[in-house]
A protein has these predicted regions:
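Short, solvent-exposed loop/turn segments at secondary-structure junctions
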Residues: 18-21, 68, 98-99, 113-116, ...
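N-terminal, active-site-proximal structural segment of metallo-dependent hydrolase catalytic domains
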Residues: 1-85, 98-100, 253-277
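Beta-strand-turn-beta hairpins that frame and shape the catalytic cleft
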Residues: 3-14, 22-25, 111-116, 129-148, ...
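Active-site beta-strand/loop signature of hydrolases that rely on acidic residues for catalysis
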Residues: 12-17, 49-73, 135, 145-149, ...
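Active site of divalent-metal-dependent phosphoester/diester hydrolases
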Residues: 70-75, 89-109, 128, 182-246
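Surface-exposed cleft-lining segments at the edges of enzyme active sites
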Residues: 34-40, 66-69, 119-123, 147-155
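Membrane-proximal envelope and lipid/glycan-remodeling enzymes
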Residues: 87-90, 147-149, 193, 233, ...
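Charged helix-capping and loop-helix junction motifs
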Residues: 75-80, 160-166
Length: 277
């Protein structure tokens, strides 16, 4: 009799706060180069090309602080640009904070697997403009739920958001939560999140910020106990003020997803979108 379960699948994950394509080399850059957050600069497009080459090696990518097309990005939707360059067919962005024509602050999903459902949620907080993308692969009790988010800077706001997240995922068996959570692995709010949402932190203390001399972990990929983590690392690419965090997981046997092979980036020639100066 043929085996109905071909075995557990591997899934390559990446979470990256890309700071709208701007690199930062020291703390003083936040002040002296703050103008770059308002206007288009050629270095942003160069950085995006470098970021896209990183993304090409993964099956599911969660992005934070990506611009969905505004003045500062030269009216380039960075999500679609990165997806085209890295060969992702399934793309979705969630704009949470729009400042006129200047910026469209967004979370984003890039996936090689077709989602069965995508839901946008607004996160609670004293200051509006935070959200979470909920992406479902499969159906029923054995569906995989992937959450992409960028949490608040303040502890009080984060605790409110954690309560929301715990209520959101409490009935799910297989969860991957990724993003810039703005808190360390040993923080009170992380302990509350792991306990209330029944998630695991596979690599506590994996420093991702600041990218030029990382000394704290603000970026995380958390998983349900049903998901086996095989490898996790912070990648040493300084295209942002955060480092990307990469993880390879093995899914439970009952969860079978149509995961295609990644395209060969060496044969891909991206269309470089024009940059308004």
């Amino acid at each position: 009799m043929a085996d109905d379960h071909p075995g557990p699948q591997q899934l390559r994950l990446l979470s990256y706060n890309i700071q709208s394509g701007l690199s930062t080399n020291k703390y003083s850059d936040y002040l002296t180069l703050s103008w770059k957050h308002l206007v288009p600069v050629p270095s942003r497009m160069t950085n995006l090309d470098g970021i896209a080459r990183i993304l090409a090696d993964y099956d599911l990518v969660g992005l934070q602080e990506v611009d969905a097309g505004s003045l500062r990005s030269g009216f380039v939707n960075q999500v679609k640009y990165l997806a085209d360059y890295a060969g992702f067919e399934h793309v979705f962005d969630q704009t949470n904070r729009k400042i006129g024509m200047i910026s469209q602050h967004s979370n984003a999903l890039l996936s090689r697997i077709c989602p069965d459902a995508i839901t946008e949620h607004k996160l609670p907080g004293l200051i509006p403009g935070r959200g979470v993308l909920e992406v479902r692969f499969g159906s029923g009790a054995d569906a995989l739920h992937v959450l992409i988010l960028h949490m608040a800077l303040g502890r009080r706001g984060r605790l409110r958001q954690i309560e929301f997240l715990a209520n959101l995922v409490c009935d799910y068996r297989h969860v991957i939560l990724m993003g810039d959570l703005n808190c360390r692995s040993d923080s009170r709010e992380m302990a509350v999140l792991l306990a209330s949402a029944r998630l695991c932190e596979p690599a506590p203390g994996l420093h991702t910020f600041p990218s030029w001399e990382p000394d704290r972990q603000l970026d995380h990929i958390l998983v349900s106990p049903s998901i086996t983590v095989e490898q996790v690392e912070a990648l040493g690419h300084v295209y942002s003020d955060h480092l990307p965090i990469a993880m390879q997981v093995r899914l439970p046997e009952e969860l079978q997803l149509p995961i295609p092979e990644a395209p060969d980036p060496s044969i891909r020639t991206p269309d470089h979108w024009s940059l308004t100066m």
